[in-house]
Amino acid sequence: MNLLITGGAGFLGQQLIRALLARGELAVSDDGAARPITRITCFDQIEGRLDDARVRNVAGDIADPGTVSSLINAETGAVIHLAAVVSGTAEADFDLGMRVNVDGTRAMLEACRRAGSCPRVVFSSSVAVFGGDLPAVVDDAVAPTPQGSYGVQKLIGEWLVHDYTRKGFIDGRSVRIPTVVVRPGKPNGAASGFASNIIREPLAGREAVLPVPVDTRMWISSPRSAVANLLHAASSPSSAWGWNRSLNLPGLSASMGEALAALEKVGGAAARARVREAHDPAIMRLVRTWPDRFNTARAQAMGFVVDRDFEAIVRAHAADYPPA
């Protein structure tokens, strides 16, 4: 069986591909039978870095229909669509966000439709589809009302996944991933990136800026849980999803003050002292539109996992990425 991971050269994509290679098989049909993975196509704007005979690294434009069509055929058992322009960039560059997040998603879905084999598609969505006047706790019955371009673009993707599934072109499911913390590597253009920066940089001996007040809460997931939940979304049967193909994934509601306390427990007072507050009104305005508490009973009943606490997330990062 062949798999396609779009956005596969990014941090989460590379972690996901490693997990798939280690597993060696995936159940993508409703009989629950696992099929051996023979090829994983890692597609992104730059080539992926994994060196494995089962991985084909391809660079290209996700919004180019011809390029995307060349990646998907009747042998493609599943597509996990991670390719996206992140929140801060999508807000700053409307045309780029629409091109990648909407046109690129449509190009992928059309390629699946033309393949004619109804592949399983996991669409990586976001809690940014919610905003405005929300209840204190959001569940799957709350109507999405995004207040930023990124959230709007992700919601359009969800609706397309619903309709392509309804028409029998794909077996789709959209998972609203919490903010993934801690991301290794360099800071990116995500408005939520500071939640990783204030942990990763101080643990590595570098200073970091917190652009929001310490009482700002966010819905958080570790990379390990995010990867596990993407795999579970890809392997769970259609019957588990029913008519609602969008799902709020489990996470932790944590304040930035709690994040800094966890940083100090793991890295000591010196690490905590490397973080300074310098509020950014644009980031504050966008982040405050996102909900920070969810009822994810449906997802947990379906077998999706949740992290224990923020300190465990920080300790896992410190273990996986020790200072050089």
Predicted features, each with a name:
Residues 277-279, 291-301, 308-324:
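Amphipathic terminal alpha-helices
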Residues 63, 92, 96-107, 144, ...:
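Glycine-rich NAD(P)-binding loop of the Rossmann-fold in SDR/ketoreductase-type enzymes
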Residues 162-217, 223-225:
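NAD(P)-dependent short-chain dehydrogenase/reductase
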Residues 202, 213, 227-229, 233-287:
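Mid/C-terminal beta-alpha module of Rossmann-like enzyme folds, strongest
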Residues 103-148:
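Conserved Rossmann-fold NAD(P)-dependent oxidoreductase catalytic core, especially the SDR/UDP-sugar
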Residues 132-134, 147-173:
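Active-site Tyr-X1-5-Lys
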Residues 49, 59-100:
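NAD(P)H-binding glycine-rich loop region in Rossmannoid oxidoreductase-like domains
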Residues 1-26:
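N-terminal Rossmann NAD(P)H-binding glycine-rich loop of SDR-like oxidoreductase domains
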